[in-house]
């Protein structure tokens, strides 16, 4: 099957050499894979519109790679809108959780939900993500905090992945918080001895993550969990240096993690260690926005030679499914250049998920995952903050969303 997206104002080519804008460009996709990218006349000489099975007229619009969201908590039950008002009155994240709210509130809702209910709730969120241009997304567990509930969450992710165009990458985050009925070290024992073996044996996750921070898990507890994950074939990831500095970024470097995420309290030494080990920093500007705290500093990592990835951190406490909004916050809040933000939301986001098939790029041989944005140049996407610019989304060359 041949798909031709033709006559665009801009085609944003993204590959190992960086970002290159083709003015007046087209893209041809053959059997799900990008076959040609370039000026419209050149592409259509080999792939004429008249002979294509599917065509997308992108006149006046911009074509770019489908967004990759490398950090979400999109599978959950219940909402926490009441806590939104509490935060606006000055209550901290830690205060709310200490009173049984926050993560523990969502845990209660998840434990009361069926796998089918969790799957359907996730599918609804994925529909929103797709409308905003996301074509690949990581989804973490972590709102179960027991073997049965964590398995239920990851089984819901697997079932949703069978039904939805967005490719889902599952992450086990049993160490998201300490359950209300457990002592921290005893719960770590349960994660290591019960949850991890069961999750790995069922092939329900690719990554093992841990929340190494104040009110969650210590450095030593995090090490134990991630090393156990490695023993079971799961690549490590880590929530690090969000509220407190616990050397989580250096632990990520030591263990060869795919990414270290959040990093609001990271230091130049952390960035240097991550660079030495090629650990991708994943910055989550939506979280800083939701918590009303200072943003992470992307230059800390860029100066160390690292490429910065962006993610939504979509969860009940950071309720945005939009990578467009994440890019806008990255530019306006973290002062990232639009080109860096776009690569962070595509190419570098895919690197944070250890994807090596060309996902997140737009080049010959890459998956035919595209966004057609209703703007004349890509800089309008972060510039026009809060407005959805995505009009058409293609997955493997098939139109899966169109306004």
Q: Residue spans of the language-model regions?
A:
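N-terminal metal-binding scaffold of metallo-dependent hydrolase/deaminase domains
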Residues: 1-46
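Short, small/polar residue-rich loop motifs at catalytic or cofactor-binding pockets
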Residues: 20-23, 49-50, 386-388
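C-terminal cap of metal-dependent C-N hydrolases
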Residues: 345-347, 367-403
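Metal-associated gating/positioning segment near the N- to mid-region
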Residues: 49-50, 58-121
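Divalent metal-coordination and catalytic microenvironments
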Residues: 8, 27, 32, 60, ...
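Active-site-adjacent C-terminal substructures of enzyme catalytic domains
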Residues: 235, 247-361, 374-375, 399-400
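Active-site-adjacent beta->alpha loops and helix N-cap segments on the catalytic face
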Residues: 89, 147-151, 216-222, 267-276, ...
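Metal-coordinating catalytic core of metallo-dependent amide/deamination hydrolases
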Residues: 109-121, 135-243
């Amino acid at each position: 099957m041949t798909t031709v997206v033709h006559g665009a104002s801009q085609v944003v080519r993204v590959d190992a050499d960086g970002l290159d804008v083709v003015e007046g460009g087209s893209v041809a996709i053959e059997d799900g894979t990008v076959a040609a990218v370039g000026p419209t006349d050149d592409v259509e000489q080999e792939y004429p519109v008249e002979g294509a099975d599917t065509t997308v007229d992108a006149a006046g619009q911009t074509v770019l790679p489908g967004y990759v969201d490398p950090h979400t908590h999109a599978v959950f039950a219940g909402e926490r809108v009441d806590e939104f008002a509490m935060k606006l009155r000055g209550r901290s994240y830690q205060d709310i959780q200490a009173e049984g709210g926050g993560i523990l509130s969502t845990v209660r809702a998840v434990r009361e939900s069926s796998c089918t209910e969790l799957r359907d709730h996730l599918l609804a969120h994925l529909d929103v993500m797709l409308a905003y241009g996301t074509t690949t997304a990581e989804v973490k567990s972590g709102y179960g905090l027991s073997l049965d509930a964590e398995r239920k969450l990851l089984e819901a992710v697997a079932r949703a992945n069978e039904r939805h165009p967005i490719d889902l990458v599952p992450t086990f985050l049993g160490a998201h918080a300490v359950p209300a009925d457990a002592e921290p070290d005893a719960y770590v024992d349960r994660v290591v001895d019960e949850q991890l073996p069961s999750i790995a044996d069922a092939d329900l996750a690719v990554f093992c993550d841990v929340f190494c921070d104040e009110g969650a898990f210590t450095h030593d507890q995090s090490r134990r969990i991630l090393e156990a994950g490695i023993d079971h074939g799961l690549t490590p990831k880590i929530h690090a240096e969000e509220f407190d500095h616990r050397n989580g970024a250096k632990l990520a470097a030591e263990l060869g993690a795919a990414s270290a995420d959040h990093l609001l309290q990271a230091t130049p030494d952390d960035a240097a260690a991550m660079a030495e080990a090629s650990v991708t920093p994943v910055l989550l500007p939506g979280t800083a926005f939701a918590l009303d705290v200072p943003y992470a500093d992307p230059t800390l990592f860029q100066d160390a030679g690292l490429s910065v990835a962006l993610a939504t951190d979509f969860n009940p406490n950071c309720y945005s499914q939009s990578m467009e909004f994440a890019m806008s916050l990255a530019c306006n809040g973290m002062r990232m250049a639009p080109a860096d933000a776009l690569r962070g939301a595509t190419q570098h986001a895919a690197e944070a998920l250890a994807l090596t098939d060309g996902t997140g790029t737009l080049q010959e041989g890459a998956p035919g995952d595209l966004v057609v944005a209703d703007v004349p140049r890509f800089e309008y996407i972060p510039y026009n903050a809060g407005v959805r610019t995505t009009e058409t989304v293609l997955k493997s060359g098939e139109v899966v969303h169109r306004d």
